[in-house]
Amino acid sequence: MRLFISLPVLIVVLAMALEGPAPAQATPDLSSTFENLPDKLKEFGNTLEDKARAAIEHIKQKEFLTKTRTWISETFGKMKEKIKTTFA
């Protein structure tokens, strides 16, 4: 009984696989590719701009932290030296 039911299902699946891609899955023609090109380029440009801005912002923040850390260490060193000369 199971073979009797599974054989038609297997034939239908095999027929669907061999008939080829559906029209929606077919490769687009050249004109539709050129029509979508400006939109894709604009999207690519926006993505690139966002990533560049984020990278620059990250670098600025990192540089700010480095400068702050350097300033704090220099100030602490000066205070330490002043205390040594005052109490020595």
Curated annotation (Swiss-Prot):
It comes from the Eukaryota. One of its GO terms (molecular function) is phospholipase inhibitor activity. The keyword Signal applies. Residues 1-26 form the signal peptide. Keywords: Lipid transport, Secreted, Signal, Transport, VLDL. It holds the Pfam family ApoC-I. It is found in: Secreted. Its main location: secreted. One of its GO terms (cellular component) is high-density lipoprotein particle. One of its GO terms (biological process) is very-low-density lipoprotein particle clearance. Coiled coil: none annotated. Belongs to the apolipoprotein C1 family. Inhibitor of lipoprotein binding to the low density lipoprotein (LDL) receptor, LDL receptor-related protein, and very low density lipoprotein (VLDL) receptor. Associates with high density lipoproteins (HDL) and the triacylglycerol-rich lipoproteins in the plasma and makes up about 10% of the protein of the VLDL and 2% of that of HDL. Appears to interfere directly with fatty acid uptake and is also the major plasma inhibitor of cholesteryl ester transfer protein (CETP). This is Apolipoprotein C-I.
